[in-house]
Amino acid sequence: VTTATSVGVSGAAGSVGRMTTTPTSTGPTEPELDETARIARDLIRFDTSNYGGGRSNGEADAAEYVEAALRDLGLEPQLFESEPGRVSVIARVEGAEPAKPGLVVHGHLDVVPADPANWSVDPFGGVVRDGMLWGRGAVDMKNMDAMMLTAVGDILRAGERPARDLVLGFLADEEAGGVLGSHFLVKEHPGLFDGATEAISEVGGYSTFIDGRRSYLLQTGEKALIWIKLRARGTAGHGSQMIEANAVTRLAEAVAVLGRQQWPIVLTDTTTALLGEVARILDVDVHEVAPDELVLRTGTAKGFIRGSLRTTTNPTMLTAGYKHNVVPDTAEALVDIRCMPGQEAAVLAEVRALIGDDVEIETMHTDIGLETPFSGPLVDAITATLDRHDPGAPVLPYLLSGGTDNKALSLLGIAGYGFAPLRLDEDMDFPAMFHGVDERVPLDALSFGSRVLRDLLSTY
């Protein structure tokens, strides 16, 4: 059962009418939830699956839910529609000291698809069970969207102001590189971010355990992104014939080479600093322990950090043929490449050398790598804020093996950090939740995150 009210959507081409829906459960009585969990649950119930390649359910309904919540706080949000149904929300919050540089606080509203057959709950049901909120987007990243709304709401309802101007962004299309979301806004509406010099968003601020000591990872860098298509050509023919120029075989060989490639370890400034801090906590000499071994001591966070040590070339999709007994003349594969900032050209050259000249390479999408200093007033404020809420817990920098909308904002000179604070138990495999089956987030972690975020936005 849904309720609907009419709102307008402002895009580059003007305003269009659309109905916004607020999903409600028709099942058994649900547990009492605090505001952050309730908002996150509501957002999960909007299926904003982004399939890539221009295929998406769209973010419009979720965007209009957010727009209504922001208007209830007395703000004047704008909705920007890059293509039909692909909607981002931007709102500016005046700070107590508007002369200070502004801070962009942003999340994305789209999610990757989920196959209900693989889940133990409805991935878009917003189910609360075992002290956790389950559903696609519970971690990536409707949790942060909810924490943003709650933190800003708490500040404004108390009659206060954030310390500086905030630009709140709830963006479309992050899961497909942000072309229709952050990159669209940066290109077509850069004035939205006037005065802002820094940003915070996802995949940082969460806790892990190192030698039994809870520590927080602040994301201060991102690997570069290169999405390529491999295309092998051959001779079409009957499946019973001897066909040496088999496109599928040629493609399979290239895919296997890239998928098995062990790229060398490359330590960026961010990763060097991280390993030094890990070694200090473990009380070992960083020069006497291999980087791989140190990373394995970072608790569940090793799932992210291992990927930050070296380039990865992961095949993700295959397409070939149309009938069992027909050898096709073309076969294609998609490969997701993530490399260190500044190494894009060298890595592509090595990929070409690895697969040879018989397979074509088409670059589908690229985005830059980033490294931001683990120093300065914002880093100091984040560290101090976490210490107020979890005294004595170290804060460590790390390079994200994936990417965020901070890449687009960097084109405007905005320095981005990953800070969506969550205090997690030691057995919570947080990296496995991203794009995983049975994605979920602890309710108490959501409450912690909204408190920390409110504190930071009030004081920085």
Go through each PLM region and give its residues.
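Acidic/His- and Gly-rich active-site-bordering loop/insert found
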Residues: 20-136, 155-164, 335
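Short pre-catalytic strand/loop immediately N-terminal to key active-site residues, enriched for Gly-Thr
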Residues: 129-140, 393-396, 437-438
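Acidic/histidine-rich catalytic neighborhood of metal-dependent amide-processing enzymes
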Residues: 133, 139-217
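Metal-dependent amide/peptide-bond hydrolase catalytic core
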Residues: 19-24, 31, 205-214, 218-221, ...
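Residue-level recognition of well-ordered beta-strand positions that form the cores
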Residues: 92, 106-108, 171, 229-233, ...
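Alpha-helix boundary/capping motif
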Residues: 3-6, 406
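Fold-independent oxyanion-binding glycine-rich loops
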Residues: 83, 107-109, 202-204, 232, ...
